[in-house]
Amino acid sequence: MVTAPYFTLCTTEQMFLDEIAELKWHKTTWAPANGARTHYGTSEDGELTCVVCIKDASEHAPIPVAGLLVHEAVHIFQRWCDDRGEHTPSHEFQAYSIQRISQELMEEFVRQTGGAK
């Protein structure tokens, strides 16, 4: 069975600060430079942990938000592959993995914000 890394979405700086406190990470900068950013760390049991931040989400239309979240999902997948030493994942594995991560990020975005305006 293949397992994905732990990942979560933060749509506000306070959510980010709460999440990194819970993860026991050293303080890091919240502000996504280009609308979104993924922070990486390691859990207490040594597993990859990813915190995706999206800034000013209420100002984005739904399509650009989806694009940003897919972009960050690709980075999560790439980092997870690197972490596992998987340098040649099959195209189908890549597609399904990125789809799953993207969909979960989008569902969480809608849950937190009620959807983009």
Model-derived regions: residue spans:
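Non-catalytic terminal regions of proteins
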Residues: 1-35
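Generic recognition of cysteine residues
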Residues: 10, 50-53, 81
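Active-site scaffold of zinc-dependent metalloenzymes
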Residues: 23-63, 76
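Acidic-and-aromatic substrate-binding clefts and catalytic sites of carbohydrate-active enzymes
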Residues: 59-60, 85, 95
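Short, conserved micro-motifs enriched in small and acidic residues
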Residues: 63-64, 68, 89-93
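Active-site recognition of the HExxH zinc-binding catalytic motif
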Residues: 67-79
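Short helix/strand-bridging catalytic loops that position acidic/His residues to coordinate divalent metals
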Residues: 80-88
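Post-HExxH zinc-binding segment in Zn-dependent metallohydrolases
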Residues: 88-117
